[in-house]
Amino acid sequence: ITGKRTPARFISQEVLIACESAEELRKKLEELNEILHTETSEPLQFGDELDRTYFAMYAGAQEGYEIDGFYTATINFLCSDPYKYAEPKKIPFADSAVTMYNNGTVEVEPIITINVASPSTFLSLGDGTEKFNQIGRQIDVSNEEPYNKYTEVFDRLGNNLTGWAIADEIDGGTVQGSFLTDGQGFRANSYGATSTLWRGPALKQSLPSLTQDFRIDAFITVKQEATNQFGRAEVYLLNAAGERIAKLAMKNTGELNSSNIGEINIRGIDDSHNIIQTAGVRPRLWNDFYGVLRLERIGNKFTAYISRIDKGIYNTAWSGTFTDYEGLYLDPLAAIQIHVGQSGANTFISDMAIHRVIVYRVNDPLANQVPNIVEAGDEVVFDHVNKNILINGESRIDLKDFAGRYFTLPKGKNTLYMLPSDIGTAKIEIRERYR
């Protein structure tokens, strides 16, 4: 067996709880039990060492005595991570390098954040020797050139209804009611007259030109507050004839224990194909959904993606692909349609909104062109703690160089370099740890 394993740490702490009565003591013990019983390791600090933090789970207790509102016990904690941690510290890079000191007693995993100022086909971090991590690849300047894979052709925020026209049709129902904007998204002002079908407002807007290879990102909220609430938020893709050629939807119709269902489908003249139709990895996972629904078509290959976004971080993602060998679903994209809907007389989901819709044209590269993987304004995070690389909150480990590693920084002096040297500004965050 190679490598080494550091055993878990056990901590025992004697406690005294003093109350004015036995009744008050019972309530205090209830509160303490609620605090101690957690599903994950939580921060643990002691009054004589407030600048250090353990991460622990409750592991039982030995009771002492109880008399007249006084109670003693020994509480045991299990730290599967045996180290104790200092407060995080952040150090900015000076131009393209940073020198910092790890004052702990063991190595640490860094988190490096780069705010990109110019496009690049790669981004690399390392110590100038064997330690490095990288996304993308550097071009051969003698015979290669960078190019932008995506060109934005349509970007509509949910803060302005200008330019939208009333749509003609929706799936399984009728266009009724109207939209309003709350400054952050399009929401239903009304759903129209009650019927047995789906109903609700729908608007459409044309793209500047027909787009064959495209990517669309739709940012949507569908948050169910009770299991008897139903509804849907949908974005349709239309061809030049106004026909629906694809749909991105988050909906709740009561199935799978009243789960929100993410759906991305493509359509031809006589049929359709669901690339994604799921509640996620478990029922009700997306019932508080705010996130992105994405569809990309390059040639005859479709890639669909759904992810919740929580505090700027993409999580609980689901993806799927489909190749249209028969050419059934290849009409050029001409317009976008948005819709939120209510089903019959059912109680509707009150928190439903379409916040933003972005459409990109996917550019066809020449043989000697290498795509830029970051653009000005992007934020890239090399998170060596969680073994992840994020671009604007979205995991992009698919871009990671095969030889790159989530390296650690030993105790003492460390220097890191960033390439390209003019890529932007950066900072490193570490949390020193001690045995």
Regions found by a protein language model. Name each.
Residues 38-83, 87-89:
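Short beta-strand and beta-hairpin "edge-sheet" elements
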Residues 27-36:
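Short amphipathic alpha-helices in soluble, non-transmembrane regions
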Residues 2-7, 64-68, 103, 207-209:
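Short, solvent-exposed beta-strand/turn "edge" segments of beta-rich domains on protein surfaces
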Residues 89-435:
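Intrinsically disordered, low-complexity segments enriched in serine, threonine, and glycine
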Residues 25-26, 44:
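Short N-terminal amphipathic alpha-helices
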Residues 21-23, 52, 64, 83-85, ...:
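Residue-level signal for secondary-structure boundary sites
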